[in-house]
Amino acid sequence: MESLTSASSTSTLLSLRSQFSKPRTPSVGFTHRVKPKLEVRCVLEAMNNAGAAAENDKEVKLWGGRFEESVTDLVERFTESISFDKELYKQDIMGSRAHASMLAKQGLMSMSDRDSILQGLDEIERSIENGEFVWRTDREDVHMNIEAALTDKIGEPAKKLHTARSRNDQATTDFRLWCRDAIDKIVARIRHLQVSMVILALKNEGLIVPGYTHLQRAQPVLLQHLLLAYVEQLERDAGRLLDCRARQNFSPLGACALAGTGLPIDRLMTSDALGFTAPMRNSIDAVSDRDFVLELLSANSITAVHLSRLGEEWVLWASEEFGFITPSDCVSTGSSIMPQKKNPDPMELVRGKSARVIGDLVTLLTLCKGLPLAYNRDLQEDKEPAFDSVKTILGMLEVSAEFAQNITFNQERIRKALPAGHLDATTLADYLVNKVSRVF
């Protein structure tokens, strides 16, 4: 069967060859048919030449030594992360300063090269902060953008900065520094909201409100007691974040790609310079796990749930049916068609955005669940959910504090609501048990 197939193929090829090798007699319109073909071939050749020229113009990647051709534009656009990980520029420059100083101290670069690198990094940082730095997609990520810009600026000394360092340990070092800074900001916002809630409680000292279970009137409680329940929840939220900060505050630098380096580096020096507690003990663990980000996003999700419950309560209390609070105009919005409306939109959005924070956690959990050791490119996708979670929770905390500072409790309406629903039934039952020995 195989020989028949081969024979058939050979016969077909010979037939085609003889057909196209026969001299053709020009006929009417032949030149008109050939001309478009020539034009197409010229266009294709021009495109190929342009592509080759563009290929030659492309900058060689940091990893491009063994490759004979560049990635396509489509692959370059798909794999870049500079569009979002430029958020890490400050932490990346911090890490590079510490690494350069360590290399110089260990004799792996000269002091003059170190000074050139540090000066160049300072100039790049100023350029970024002034909005003058040009982020390039062809340089893939924040690390290569800064390193290539440094090479453009100071030349050969910049190429020594990557000694004893991989983007694997560099990226997770940057990310740990960023998460540490993010935790500090979130905890500060939590404290601000706690203070706002305490002030609100003090302004309404002695006010009794209906307490609810199952959204049914249950027992009378002090408003202060109710507001301080949220303060306690927020205290635990802050505690979780601080615990997370302590666990993630270890330095991955020196782990390199996954197996460390044979060069005589000083991991303790870089760890101390960056404010870490100590270097991480296992190089594979250092570059491959993102549990420190998962823990942060988990803590954010719990905080978001607490804020969502607060938002739900205040939205209910601002309704005509309850009428317990009146938000100021400065924290309310109206309707485009109903002129009487005054909506507590900020707290509705706090309630809504909690879904987004929880979704960011689920995204990262799903990303990490099937990855073999050690590093995988999938982990490039860990940044955006983390950035979004932190940005969203900061906004939720800030607007909740703003709302707390701009609401009024309608004390007369609350007092009129107290008699309904037999709120003192439990107190009466307790009295009967205590005074007349009735079983209840």
Where does each model-flagged region fall?
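Generic, well-ordered alpha-helical scaffold segments in large soluble proteins
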Residues: 99, 120-127, 149, 153, ...
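Short, well-ordered beta-strand elements within core beta-sheets of diverse protein domains
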Residues: 99-109, 225, 294-302, 427-436
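Glycine-rich cofactor/substrate-binding loops
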Residues: 2-8, 43-91, 95, 340-440
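Short amphipathic alpha-helical segments with heptad-repeat character
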Residues: 180-187, 191, 224, 228-231, ...
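N-terminal chloroplast transit peptides
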Residues: 1-35
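Hydrophobic alpha-helical scaffolding
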Residues: 86-89, 110, 136, 140, ...
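A helix-coil-helix interface module used to build multimeric assemblies
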Residues: 2-6, 36-260, 264-272, 278, ...
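Acidic, glycine-rich loop-and-beta core segments that form the ion-binding/anion-interacting portion
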Residues: 269-366
